[in-house]
Curated annotation (Swiss-Prot):
It catalyses: Endonucleolytic cleavage to 5'-phosphomonoester. Keywords: Cytoplasm, Endonuclease, Hydrolase, Manganese, Metal-binding, Nuclease. Residues 70-258 form the RNase H type-2 domain. One of its GO terms (molecular function) is RNA-DNA hybrid ribonuclease activity. It holds the Pfam family RNase_HII. It comes from Streptococcus pneumoniae (strain 70585). GO terms for biological process: DNA replication, removal of RNA primer; mismatch repair. The keyword Protein transport does not apply. A divalent metal cation binds at D76, E77, D168. This is Ribonuclease HII. Signal peptide: none annotated. Belongs to the RNase HII family.
Length: 259
């Protein structure tokens, strides 16, 4: 009779819920064996569910594949709302039918998984472009226009250039066919890939700024208006990376000028 350890090693090779190996092992009434069977079935079911989820996020891409297009770029940005730091956009071209396990809207990915999935995108993408527009430009042209500039910069770095753009809730003035998708980072794998690249890139930048400008907790809040960030603003004032067109930074700058 096989040991439970041997059965556990055998079960790792089973990839289908209908496998005859399950049927045979279910005759073994040892509780340890039944526990390992249940555990393996849960893993297989989770993998099937994940594959279905990823498949559903390729619906926009598949429509474009039918038209003979393969160089499809997903575009997304991070950093519209913070009081400090740049807005960062990424453009990513994935191989046809590419499925990266765990890839999703970056806001839905556990923080501890960010770097792992970012690396998987880096490893598998055909091309990646990153656009970074700093706070000074944001203050000059407004955050909406700055976001478009960041996206255009990211797209310009792609090689080969894309045949079609899938963009998260935005239209760009570019001579490339494009589809604007509401909640695109949750509905398109290409946009989700861009989302995690932009997120990790910006988070790393804000960690560097945290070393330059201590007291604002940039490494944790990424420039968003948390209690610690606002406390830092009150105590230490405005840094060179703060967006002076955003409140309450704007009022602090005006108050300083008037005093």
């Amino acid at each position: 009779m096989a040991t439970i350890k041997e059965i556990k090693e055998l079960l790792v090779t089973v990839k289908e819920l209908e496998s005859p190996i399950f049927l045979e092992l279910e005759k073994d009434n040892r509780s340890g064996v039944q526990k390992e069977i249940s555990k393996r079935k849960r893993v297989i079911q989770a993998e099937l569910d994940e594959n279905l989820r990823l498949e559903s996020m390729l619906s926009y891409e598949k429509e474009l594949y039918k038209q003979g297009l393969t160089l499809i770029a997903g575009i997304d940005e991070v950093g519209r709302g913070p009081l400090a730091g740049p807005v960062v956009a990424a453009a990513v071209i994935l191989p046809k039918n590419c499925k990266i396990k765990g890839l999703n809207d970056s806001k839905k990915i556990p923080k501890k998984k960010h770097l792992e999935i970012f690396q998987a995108v880096q490893d598998q993408a055909l091309s990646i472009g990153i656009g970074i527009i700093d706070n000074q430009v944001i203050d000059q042209v407004n955050i909406y226009e700055a976001t478009k500039l960041a996206m255009q910069e990211a797209i310009s770095q792609l090689s080969p250039q894309p045949e079609h753009l899938l963009i998260d809730a935005m239209k760009l003035d570019l001579p490339i066919s494009q589809t604007s998708i509401i909640k695109g980072d949750a509905n398109s794998l290409s946009i989700a890939a861009a989302s995690i690249v932009a997120k990790v890139t910006r988070d790393e930048l804000m960690k560097e700024y945290d070393q330059q400008f201590s007291g604002y907790d940039f490494a944790t809040n990424a420039g968003y208006g948390t209690a610690k960030h606002l406390e830092g603003l009150t105590k230490l004032g405005v840094t060179p990376i703060h967006r002076t067109s955003f409140e309450p930074v704007k009022s602090l700058v005006l108050g300083k000028k008037e005093s």
